[in-house]
Amino acid sequence: MAGAELIGNEEMKEVMDVLETGVFMRYGFDKERQGIFKVKQFEEEFAQYCGSTYALGVTSGSSALKVALAAMGVGPGDEVIVPAFTFVATWEAVLEVGAIPVMGDIDAT
């Protein structure tokens, strides 16, 4: 499988650390977590890498689009220009924050 060669002992250990706690949620269960906060650690390191104060790990690109729109203050009644040829998540994220997707294209033909 393509990409499998990139998974080595270090990656396996990181995953096993989480699996061994039995806690698969981002928040809560601090005692059971045994001091293992992989997502929080990633968010902090990624924010620092990007020169940002905040970063938020999410479950998918769809979630990332929705979070980005909300972070920019996009909401009900706002119009957001989206590509006419794209994956449906682009439009769904706009609709989920209550905004109106406006299809745009780069070629009049």
Where in the sequence are the language-model features?
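PLP-dependent aminotransferase-like
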Residues: A70-T109
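Conserved PLP-binding active-site segment in aminotransferase class I/II-type PLP enzymes
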Residues: M1-A70, G75, V97
